[in-house]
Swiss-Prot record:
Origin species: Arabidopsis thaliana (Mouse-ear cress)
Name assigned to this protein: Mechanosensitive ion channel protein 8
Record keywords, A-Z: Cell membrane, Ion channel, Ion transport, Membrane, Transmembrane, Transmembrane helix, Transport
Similarity comment text for this entry: Belongs to the MscS (TC 1.A.23) family.
Lineage, uppermost ranks: Eukaryota, Viridiplantae, Streptophyta, Embryophyta, Tracheophyta
Gene name of the record: MSL8
Annotated stretches, region: Disordered: 1-88, 148-172, 190-221, 242-265
Annotated transmembrane regions: 298-318, 341-361, 381-401, 411-431, 673-693, 709-729
Tissues of expression: Expressed in tricellular and mature pollen, and in germinating tube. Not detected in leaves or roots.
Function of the molecule: Mechanosensitive channel that opens in response to stretch forces in the membrane lipid bilayer. Exhibits a 6.3-fold preference for chloride over sodium. Regulates osmotic forces during pollen hydration and germination.
Membrane topology summary: Multi-pass membrane protein
């Protein structure tokens, strides 16, 4: 509790006053923490429930609130009470007591109170409504307290202390008032609601009581609560914390809800969730249905109608004699019709050519995997190139120099140049689009495919293990079907079977041949499902994965969270995505407990391979066993190993999603930059071909280019180096722990020009990529299992036998922890120091790298504790090396207290 507010003077006009006592000293002269009034009345507040308050005012409205110098604090319930109770003594007669029950805080603060009977009849609190509470004083006065405040303050703030006094300044616009409406017995009065609370902080507010003399019959008293700026500062601090929160940390939870009721819409036996995005609907393995289906829009319909009309007109022009003689600008009519046909319907015809090329590409497996994506990606640009090429050819061969001589127009050459400019612009844009798509696809495949494949397999394992045992149910179903077939054969052969056997083989309500499709272990991909089966995912590699499938996998990782499956929710038709998503490490731990209870046998402390095979196929179960620490060596999975794996899987999935998002943003920005450069090149081409740029203009432009190169040359160089560093070198991803200049940093965000890191104390450090280009970067995440070093010293007089025993016992301990350390750790006598210290070194190798630095130090600390234990058991202690002291002369002893036998003149 903050007592600084209690020591402030009360210069406000709102003070504690009694209507009948005008000679009461001002609060400025009241002693602090002292018994001022020997006989006075007080108020009793007893909070027996989180939302209830009891108070009693002695002598009605003439009861001032006072404080005393006796304060007691404690953390535990050691005072003989069952509730958190702390006391503050205000006076001997009229004390004030506050008791808190069920408070979440470890400590408490109360006011010690005396004996004052309290009568109360509180009304029930209703959310969103004012709370009316009534108390009776000594003179049978009835006091009504109306409380109405924000609901969010009720659950997070503490009980107000009546010792708080008014601050030096008040904000009248934001003050909160609590009205005490007093009536005598026999009267009736209904108090109006006022904004206050039964539970709010007193450290940031102060309260005073004043008398409202406008209504003498009601004699209403008010407690005015003035909120200080500290509450607003705290809110702003919370907002700033949210803004500066790391993306690698769990988001804040506003409500603590139990993590239960997990469910998944469909167990796909590896069919991963589908992603519906408007720019890339993918319903087939390699080619989307959008490209397989023909579109018929308004423009296409007009092109078809124009094609039919122009072909009909062309046929009439070639067959009708009178039309053959018609000339326009000394050109036959059919030439104009051919030109209109190419100009209006050329794009439609070029689309037919693209479809023919795609048809032959689809017949070839390798071309379909590697080339088809890029063909569809640039199909519009290719279609425009073919169309403009046809238009240019038709214009060149139909409108020859004879037409120019006849028309004597200087505009026709410009038309030719404009068509050439359009064609070159389209070809240049086509090359740009193709290069960007090829580079982006190859970058994503080479960099993220392995991590995406591993993350999706982890998601499949989590969903499968949290659901019902599919494989076991399928096996039981097959056994039941075989038993039923045998019974059918025996019945057809005329054998008499006991009715119990038939009833057991054919239970009522079950045919034995139909299985719940939601529980089916293998579900084929339907035409409407965009999922990817695990069999298909396992067959993918860097060489055979298509660009479309890679794009699908990236969308799944970016947009789909880790989910669990609850067998009880399979039959539910109501889908709430938030109830089955793992969005924090806390939920990941809860999901691990749920999965362990679902997979383990009754009463077992570990999960074995046989338990996994109830949910997964044998090859998948073997692969899953290798994911948990210690499982390959011990052939079992512990609770801690399952929890650690699921938490690490959640962290990896979150970091991978952030990496893909940052990479997508960087690629889009790079694409925009290339678009700007391409547009500038196209403008220059137009100026040159149309001969708009004369020699003077070119000279002026070149001078400006030189000036811009001098100003922005270093910037262009920096941008180019940053792009090469990010997409070619690519030394890290989001979430990787790196070491730069001997400082360990975690990658927070990647951009084209900069990278944001988090230091060990969560300090954000921003490095320019051009500067990182020149530094050595150590990446812990991409490192293999890393070693460690532990050194300790013993005295030189330590026997070699003990040193051998130390080595043997440490080696045995490391070998007995195969889930943490590799066996046969190196233990050597490293050095001899000052002829009396022998330095020993232990060089073990972890089963992990140092990406999780906390886990690394935890395992190392356990090993150091074991070394200390071994040294203590072998009585290896620290000793000072004995020193030889040579005394050459000694002064004569002149003393009456000389031991017998000593001579005063004995030489030294």
């Amino acid at each position: 509790m903050d007592f600084r507010n209690s020591f402030k003077s009360h210069s406000s006009y709102k003070q504690i006053r009694s209507p009948g006592d005008q000679s009461e000293p001002s609060p400025e002269h009241l002693p602090i923490l002292h018994d001022h009034h020997p006989d006075h009345s007080g108020m009793v507040v007893d909070d027996q429930k989180p939302d209830s308050t009891r108070s009693s005012l002695d002598d009605g409205r003439n009861a001032p609130v006072e404080r005393d110098a006796s304060y007691k604090f404690w953390q535990d319930n050691t005072t003989g009470t069952s509730t958190d109770h702390t006391a503050v003594r205000t006076s001997d007669k009229d004390p004030i007591a506050i008791s808190r029950k069920g408070d979440r805080l470890s400590g408490s603060f109360d006011f010690v109170h005396g004996k004052l009977p309290v009568d109360e009849s509180p009304t029930k609190m209703v959310a969103g409504e004012p709370v009316n509470r009534q108390w009776r004083g000594r003179n049978n006065e009835e006091i009504t307290l109306d409380v109405d405040q924000e609901n969010d303050d009720v659950s997070h703030q503490t009980m107000p202390t009546p010792t708080s006094t008014a601050r030096t300044s008040f904000d009248a616009s934001r003050e909160m008032r609590v009205s005490f409406n007093v009536r005598r017995a026999g009267g009736a009065f209904v108090a109006g609601s006022v904004p206050s609370s039964s539970s709010h902080s007193s450290s940031s507010s102060s309260a005073t009581m004043r008398t409202n003399q406008d209504q003498p019959q009601l004699q209403e008293e008010e407690v005015v609560r003035c909120t200080s700026n500290m509450s607003f500062q705290r809110k702003s601090e919370l907002i700033s914390r949210v803004k500066t929160r790391s993306r690698l940390q769990d988001p804040p939870r506003e409500e603590e809800t139990p993590y239960s009721g997990w469910r998944s819409g469909q167990l796909k036996s590896g069919l991963l969730a589908d992603i519906d995005e408007e720019d890339d609907p993918l319903a087939e393995e390699d080619v989307p249905d959008e490209y397989k289906r023909g579109k018929l829009d308004a423009i296409t319909l007009l092109q078809w109608l124009s094609l039919v009309a122009i072909i009909a007109a062309l046929a009439c022009s070639l067959s009708i004699q009178s039309w053959k003689k018609v000339r326009v600008w000394n050109l036959h009519l059919w030439k104009w019709e051919v030109f209109l046909l190419v100009l209006i319907c050329g794009r439609l015809v070029s689309g037919w050519g693209i479809r023919i090329v795609v048809f032959f590409i689809e017949r070839n497996f390798l071309l379909r995997k590697r080339v088809l994506y890029f063909v569809y990606g640039v199909r519009r640009a290719v279609q425009n190139c073919l169309w403009l090429g046809l238009v240019l050819l038709a214009w060149h061969f139909l409108f020859d120099k004879k037409v120019q001589r006849e028309t004597r127009s200087r505009f026709l050459p410009y038309v030719t140049k404009i068509l050439v400019c359009f064609l070159l612009s389209t070809i240049l844009w086509l090359i740009k689009t193709l290069v960007v798509k090829v580079l982006a696809s190859s970058f994503h495949v080479s960099t993220y495919f392995d991590r995406i494949q591993e993350a999706l397999f982890n998601q499949y394992v989590i969903e499968t293990l949290s659901g019902p045992p599919m494989i076991e149910m399928s096996r039981i179903e097959e056994e039941e079907e075989r038993a039923q077939d045998e019974i059918f054969k025996m019945q057809n052969a005329g054998a008499n079977l006991p009715p119990d056997l038939c009833a057991a083989a054919f239970p009522p309500g079950k045919s034995g041949r139909v299985m719940n499709p939601k529980l089916s272990p293998i579900i084929p991909k339907s035409t409407t499902d965009n999922g990817i089966s695990m069999e298909h995912l396992h067959r993918m590699n860097h060489k055979n994965i298509s660009a479309w499938n890679m794009k699908r996998l990236m969308k799944i990782v970016r947009n789909v969270s880790l989910t669990t499956l609850d067998e009880q929710m399979l039959e539910s038709t109501y889908e709430d995505e938030s109830t089955r998503q793992i969005r924090s490490e806390k939920e990941a731990k809860a999901a691990a407990r749920k999965i362990f209870k679902n997979v383990e046998q009754r009463g077992a402390k570990y999960i074995y391979l046989e338990d996994l095979m109830r949910f997964l196929r044998e090859d998948e179960a073997m692969k899953t066993m290798g994911l948990f620490e210690g499982a390959p060596e011990n052939k079992r999975i512990s609770k801690s190993a399952l929890k650690n794996w699921l938490v690490n899987a959640f962290r990896e999935r979150r970091a991978l999603a952030l990496t893909l998002n940052d990479t997508k943003t960087a690629v889009n920005k790079l694409h925009h930059m290339i678009n700007i450069v391409t547009a500038i090149v196209i403008v220059v081409i137009w100026l040159v071909l149309l001969e708009i740029a004369s020699s003077k203009v070119l000279l002026f432009v070149s001078s400006q280019v030189v000036l811009l190169a001098f100003i922005f040359g270093n910037t262009v160089k920096t941008v180019f180096e940053s792009i090469i560093f990010l997409f070619i070198v690519h030394p890290y991803d989001v979430g990787d722990r790196c070491e730069i200049d001997s400082v360990q940093l975690v990658v927070e965000e990647m951009n084209i020009l900069t990278t944001v890191f988090l230091r060990y104390d969560n300090l954000k450090i921003m490095y320019p990529n051009s500067l990182l280009w020149q530094k050595s970067i150590n990446n812990y995440y991409r490192s293999p299992d890393m070693g460690d070093a532990i050194e300790f010293c013993v005295h030189i007089t330590t026997p070699l036998e003990k040193i051998s025993v130390i080595k043997q016992r440490i080696s045995n301990y490391i070998d007995n922890k195969p889930e943490y350390w590799y066996p046969q750790a190196k233990i050597i006598v490293k050095d001899l120091e000052d002829l009396h210290i022998v330095r020993l070194a232990i060089w073990p190798c972890h089963r992990i790298n140092h990406q999780d630095m906390a886990e690394r130090w935890t395992r190392r600390a356990v090993l150091v504790e074991e070394v200390i234990k071994i040294l203590l058991e072998l009585d290896i202690q620290h000793r000072f090396y004995p020193l030889d002291i040579n005394v050459r002369t000694m002064p004569t002893v002149v003393s009456s207290r000389v031991p017998p036998g000593w001579s005063q003149n004995q030489p030294a």
